[in-house]
């Protein structure tokens, strides 16, 4: 019998981290396998093993809408109020041949139910409906909470986990056979949901995310990042749902298939919605066309299929015929070490030699400024160090906040959260405290590295359970109870022991970085050769990747960058994959870029040419005094700072990098000799415009956009606080609302925040807003621009009603619409003046409307 991990007391007080709690209870944590699951029968087992197909059901919301569900009704309450309607729809899917019937619990979390019913009661009623319909397998459906997690929103990871855990326990009690987590856009949120399933049940977990037209989720996660992370944290089947039609999702699913061995599932929409001549929302892809498009995905290796918005029992019947005549196509990921943030993958293939620079600067050892920042809780400075290293060429950031006088568990959690909101790079969590390590990796959105274990049995006993439970990578140091050995063979022996111990937890060599530990040449000159030899042995015999803290070699010697860069080149020749170094060192980075050409990692030398096209040889200093001055420093300037593009505007740098900690003081300083409107129009607005361009180019994603907007908000608030009333011009009035019947307001809130920071006066009417209330506000406030949001197809009717009312009563008003179910064509059909695909587009439309 599975025993859930008890991590909170009855009053909600945290008792222990899950792995610590399990360890005290005598449990041994290892990488989860299929044998750890409670699987109903062999058919379901075959699907989870990837040797058999499985057919989920199709759309429920659009079927309910067709059955007469009123706009604004909570579908989950129909399990009590009209259970026969739910059962009838599900019975149609059973008769169409669906293996899995999804319980009507998509929005059955306490946040969305908001007291309308208990989570337990909804799950019990929903599962009863599915059983009554004759379902072979009933899936407990877990959808998004409907609130942004920190740092973008106010909901903590732990609060999200608790909401999901309540659903999981309710599902287990109601008798579900598996869980399906779907329509997720936030990698941190889906991680919380998967962990809640794993830690509160032993049932199979299917997990899918939703992707935009650009191939990324709302928060910028790619299919590869999603698949790697979901695989790592223990989803048994992973994939894509909703999003678009099956033809558009084929390429995204194919990308997932290249990075995971887990079964991949797809539940596509029947195309994108439109409004027909009678005012009804319809989907155009019919069953034969749908099945034909899905057939291509099945040929690629997708083995679990179903449908989402607009699909019907007819669509599923066509899929039943398709999969009954097909055996799953095998797929295998190419062996590699993959490290991810929520937006970026750093991939080190096992059959090649690729370099990943791990930035070392977020480590308080010997850095007084960072030490003081950590004591003061100044995480803005920590973030600035991460951003600088990203701009200087780091691929991964090491994060170490270890000072004896601070609460390391609290600070490392906050630091990783803030770094993930401001940089795109994956993180390496560096701590000797297992509690601090778990606090960071548990809440980390992606697949990180833990730094580190070593050959001491106690350390391996503490750290490997974390690596196994959270699916991370790990650094293994070649030291043990006897210290650091002198010889290559002794170092290799420790590495071999680390790899063997890791295997006991199901951790393969493709998740291990061995660090053979660099000793300074000033006191251990002969050790350099032994270090390189040890690394070569590890690479050849263990199949691991290797890391080295290369800066240590030159400690205590003059011209440190010179010696360090030569050692770095030698280490690359011996097989070094991940140098832990200062990316701000010119000589180190020169060596990295040069080696990438010689190893053919930089194909066509394009990166090298881009970096060095205008290079001045520092050794020609006798003939060129300017070169001598340039050669006197070994610092790589961060991109976007003075010296690279000539723009030394501190406001611009702080807004673009999302650094809000210092912007208030800088704004106050500039106000001493700048007019307030000059500061806004010539400093803040251009910076926000630049962020918008970076967002459009795919160089920034929503977390970075939000961090920049928050930094700008702090600056604007400072200006408003210090300036007399009326001195700051109002750029225009805008009203935003989520339409009647729709309780989702994440997108609308993001738009409001950005428009606020562009200087507009924004009236936020909230969610589930009646058309008459919107009209009343527009008339009373003399508003020229209205933004309407809808996430569900069932509420687009209310959006159209609101648009028609506004245009009839206030002819001059302009209306922007946005939301996951909308397209430019759909927006035009329902009468909107503008369609905004994202918040940045809303800001540009506002500038057009108000003539700014």
Task: Cite the ranges covered by each PLM segment.
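Domain-level signal for soluble alpha/beta catalytic cores
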Residues: 1-513, 519-852
